[in-house]
Amino acid sequence: NLLNKRFYDYEDDIKTNPTTRKLDDHVLVVDGFNTFIRAFSVNPSLNEDGSHVGGLVGFLKSIRYTINKFKPTRCVIVFDGKNSSKSRQKVFPEYKAGCKVRSRLNRNVDWSGGPHDEVVSMKLQISRLVEYLECLPITILSLDNLEADDVISYICTSTLKGSKCTIMSSDKDFYQLVNDKIQLYSPTKKITYDRDLIRKEFGVYPQNVLTCRIVDGDKSDGIPGVRGIGVKTLVKEFPILTEDEHFDAKELLVSANKKTTRISEMLVKNEYIIKRNYILMQLHDPDIKNQTKLKIVDAVNSLVPKLVKYQLQTLFVKDKLWGQIPNFDNWLTEFNIL
């Protein structure tokens, strides 16, 4: 079919001709929902009417701060699509089943109506946020049945192959993607992770992070690992993981089968957990249909939207945000670099 032919032609082209557009010299790729939830959880800001606007304001301020910090040539924000967890829940039904929003610092906010009020506020704010973002010179992506992680991975490793990419997220899943062209900025820690910093903090280089994490599991997504084996224990058993070469899950299991230690025997016994977690946690080869990949390519390669200042000002006045962003015109100037 023509769509598949177009996709394979594109794949061949990107392998031999990585992107050279000046626009794509340094792309800031934002994990949208991760950034929003962090802002919603910790930012207690209220507008003039006393409504909680922490998610909206916190997100906008965070994006502006990060653009000012890195001076990217463009910005792409990716949100989880509808039914985004569905494919992974087919593999493991408990995936993200217990994920909840934690309003750690929202002491000024009256959630007396219980979780329902909080969820309603969150939905209203994220919907409004998209209206703001559509007025900024930013590319926004959200695709049904896909998590932002998978789309971000495809953008950074394929669509923008050859470009410098800064991923903005507090999600450790992205450690595995870091290389000479891709870095990870954690807005919670205000730290930018390159290969060496991940080696220093996590104990292994990025290419072996996935091997460690599929054994350790991921509590934030409700993915259990092999009980009793953490990263430090695994690295002690297999020191090769600390070296600057790829040691994947398949090699781990082959090596474990050759040893008679308790740790290796536990790994062999729980092989199914390791293989399942690999499917759930790997981002290098995201499960995206060819037609959907073309949608991502078209969105990233399209012209960057123009700044629509008058529409932004209208939203700003309607939402009564002058107490949170006092000098709106000055605040907007940072987006002019995009």
Question: Predicted regions span which residues?
Answer:
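Non-catalytic terminal extensions that flank enzyme cores
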Residues: N1-D13, V317, P326-N330, I337
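A short, charged helix-loop
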Residues: T192-S220
